[in-house]
C-alpha cells in the first residue's frame, strides 16, 4: 500500500515570540520541519503535503530546500487540526493509499514508530499514536478496550477514573485517504473554540463501524515544541541521545555533555572527541581521528588518523586526508589537505589544495579574495611553506618547493625551487638609542604642556 504524508506546519507559535514560523526553529542545526520530514521520508511516501499558514512563504521556501518534491498548501484561517488536514485534499486527489498525519513541531517521532503505525493500519481502519506519560498533566486520554481504541477523552472532560489513565494522545494518526477525508467532512466545530478537531475522527469512525486502534511509542518521541524553553529542552534531548549513540558505537567523548552535534554528524569508531567541540551540519569524521578541544567543524570530511585542533575551524569544503594535522588557530575552507600534510599553527587555507607530506609554516595565509572573486592556491607534495608566507592567489607552488619566511608569493614557484620575496634587512648602528631618546624627549615636552 502506498503512503502519503500530511505535515501540519501552519501554527504561528505565539509563545516562541519570534518572526520565524515555529516549525523553522532549529534543533541540531535543522528546522523542526526537516526532522519531521526526514522521519516520514523513511516510509518512502508517494506524496508529501505540508500545510502552511503563518509566514507561509518562508515555510514554502524551506520545504523546497528540504524536499523539492513536496507540495505546500495554505491554511488561510487557523480553524483547527481537522480543518488543516482538509486543506491537503486537493493535493491528494486520486491518491488511494494511507495518509500519515505528522506535526511540524513534533520533531522526534522515529521512522520505526511510523513503520509500526503503517503495519497497524493493515489491521485497523484508523491508527492513533499514543504514549505512556510520566506526568499525564492535561493530555487527552486514550481509552482502550483490548486492542481497540474506544475514544479519546480530553482532560477537562475526563472522569477521575479516566484521568488516572496514563496512555495519552500524541495527535499523530494514520488512515486510508478516502476514509479520512470522508470522516473529516463530518467533523463539526460546535465547541468552545469553534475549531475542527482531528481527534473527532475516532468517535466518527466508531459510529460508522470502523475499527480504531492505538500504537504506543516512547514519550520523548512525542515532545512538542511551543516555547523557547521547550526548544532548549528538545535540543538537550537530541544531544543526549546523539552522544549516547556515539558512545555505543565506540567513539570516545572525554566530556560528552560539552560536545555539540548536528542532526547529520557521522563519526567513526575509535575517534576521540575532546571537550567543547562543535559539529555543524555536513560533517563526517572517519575512524581513529582526534578532534581536540574547542574546535568547530561544519561541512567537512576528516579522514582516518587525522588530528584537528585544539581551537581549529574546518569550514564547508574542507577535506582532510589520512594522517593530516590541522593545529591551533588554523582555519580551512574549501580546501583539500593531502595525506600526511601538516598545517599546525595560526594559518588560513582557503580555496586551495595542499599536497602530500607538505608542511605549512605558522602564520601562512592564502590570499584568495581580490574583493570581487575567489582564486585558488595550489601547493604540491613535500613542499615547505615558510612561516608568515602570503600566497597571493591564483598561484602555484610546486612539488618539493620552498618559500622563505615572510615571503609574499605572487608568482608560481616551480618544482624544487626556493622562493624569496621580502625586503632585504638593513641594520642602522646606534639608531635605536637615538630614536628612543628623541621620543622620550617629545613625551616629556608634551607632559609639561
Curated annotation (Swiss-Prot):
Binds 1 Mg(2+) ion per subunit. It catalyses: alpha-D-glucosamine 1-phosphate + acetyl-CoA = N-acetyl-alpha-D-glucosamine 1-phosphate + CoA + H(+); N-acetyl-alpha-D-glucosamine 1-phosphate + UTP + H(+) = UDP-N-acetyl-alpha-D-glucosamine + diphosphate. Residues 250-449 are annotated as: N-acetyltransferase. Residues 1-228 are annotated as: Pyrophosphorylase. Its EC number is 2.7.7.23, 2.3.1.157. UDP-N-acetyl-alpha-D-glucosamine binds at residues 8-11, 22, 75, 80-81, 103-105, 140, 154, 169, 226, 315, 333, 348, 359. Pathway: Nucleotide-sugar biosynthesis; UDP-N-acetyl-alpha-D-glucosamine biosynthesis; N-acetyl-alpha-D-glucosamine 1-phosphate from alpha-D-glucosamine 6-phosphate (route II): step 2/2; Nucleotide-sugar biosynthesis; UDP-N-acetyl-alpha-D-glucosamine biosynthesis; UDP-N-acetyl-alpha-D-glucosamine from N-acetyl-alpha-D-glucosamine 1-phosphate: step 1/1; Bacterial outer membrane biogenesis; LPS lipid A biosynthesis. Its cofactor is Mg(2+). It is found in: Cytoplasm. Catalyzes the last two sequential reactions in the de novo biosynthetic pathway for UDP-N-acetylglucosamine (UDP-GlcNAc). The C-terminal domain catalyzes the transfer of acetyl group from acetyl coenzyme A to glucosamine-1-phosphate (GlcN-1-P) to produce N-acetylglucosamine-1-phosphate (GlcNAc-1-P), which is converted into UDP-GlcNAc by the transfer of uridine 5-monophosphate (from uridine 5-triphosphate), a reaction catalyzed by the N-terminal domain. Homotrimer. This is Bifunctional protein GlmU. It comes from Ruegeria sp. (strain TM1040) (Silicibacter sp.). The gene is glmU.
Amino acid at each position: 500500500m502506498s503512503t502519503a504524508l500530511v505535515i501540519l506546519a501552519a501554527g504561528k507559535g505565539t509563545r516562541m515570540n519570534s518572526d520565524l514560523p515555529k516549525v523553522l526553529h532549529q534543533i541540531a542545526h535543522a528546522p523542526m520541519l526537516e526532522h519531521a520530514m526526514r522521519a516520514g521520508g523513511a516510509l518512502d511516501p508517494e506524496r508529501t503535503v505540508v500545510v502552511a499558514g503563518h509566514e507561509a512563504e518562508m515555510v514554502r521556501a524551506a520545504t523546497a530546500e528540504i524536499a523539492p518534491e513536496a507540495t505546500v498548501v495554505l491554511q488561510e484561517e487557523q480553524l483547527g487540526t481537522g480543518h488543516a488536514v482538509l486543506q491537503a485534499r486537493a493535493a491528494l486527489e486520486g491518491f488511494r493509499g494511507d495518509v500519515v498525519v505528522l506535526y511540524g513541531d513534533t520533531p522526534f517521532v522515529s521512522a520505526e514508530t511510523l513503520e509500526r503505525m503503517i503495519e497497524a493500519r493493515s489491521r485497523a481502519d484508523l491508527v492513533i499514536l499514543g504514549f505512556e506519560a510520566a506526568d499525564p498533566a492535561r493530555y487527552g486520554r486514550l481509552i482502550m478496550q483490548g486492542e481497540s481504541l474506544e475514544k479519546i477523552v480530553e482532560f477537562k472532560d475526563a472522569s477521575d477514573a479516566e484521568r488516572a489513565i496514563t496512555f495519552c494522545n500524541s495527535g499523530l494518526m494514520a488512515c486510508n485517504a478516502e476514509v479520512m477525508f470522508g470522516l473529516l467532512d463530518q467533523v463539526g466545530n460546535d465547541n468552545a473554540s469553534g475549531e475542527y478537531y482531528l481527534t473527532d475522527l475516532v468517535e466518527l469512525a466508531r459510529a460508522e463501524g470502523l475499527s480504531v486502534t492505538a500504537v504506543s511509542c516512547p514519550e520523548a518521541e512525542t515532545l512538542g515544541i511551543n516555547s523557547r524553553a521547550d526548544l532548549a529542552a528538545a535540543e538537550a534531548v537530541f544531544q543526549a541521545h546523539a552522544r549516547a549513540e556515539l558512545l555505543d558505537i565506540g567513539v570516545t567523548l572525554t566530556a560528552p555533555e560539552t560536545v555539540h552535534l548536528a542532526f547529520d554528524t557521522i563519526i567513526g569508531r575509535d575517534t576521540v572527541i575532546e571537550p567543547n567541540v562543535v559539529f555543524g551540519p555536513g560533517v563526517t569524521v572517519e575512524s581513529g581521528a582526534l578532534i581536540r578541544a574547542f574546535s568547530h567543524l561544519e561541512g567537512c570530511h576528516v579522514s582516518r588518523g587525522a588530528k584537528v585542533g585544539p581551537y581549529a575551524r574546518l569550514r564547508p569544503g574542507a577535506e582532510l586526508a589520512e594522517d593530516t594535522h590541522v593545529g591551533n588557530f588554523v582555519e580551512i575552507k574549501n580546501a583539500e589537505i593531502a595525506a600526511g600534510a601538516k598545517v599546525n599553527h595560526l594559518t588560513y587555507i582557503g580555496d586551495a589544495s595542499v599536497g602530500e607530506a607538505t608542511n605549512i609554516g605558522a602564520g601562512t595565509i592564502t590570499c584568495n579574495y581580490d574583493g570581487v572573486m575567489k582564486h585558488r592556491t595550489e601547493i604540491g607534495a613535500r613542499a615547505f611553506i615558510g612561516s608568515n608566507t602570503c600566497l597571493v592567489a591564483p598561484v602555484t607552488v610546486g612539488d618539493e618547493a620552498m618559500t622563505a619566511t615572510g615571503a609574499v608569493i605572487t608568482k608560481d614557484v616551480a618544482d624544487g625551487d626556493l622562493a624569496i620575496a621580502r625586503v632585504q634587512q638593513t641594520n642602522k648602528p646606534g639608531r635605536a638609542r637615538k630614536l628612543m631618546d628623541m621620543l622620550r624627549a617629545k613625551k616629556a615636552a608634551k607632559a609639561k604642556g
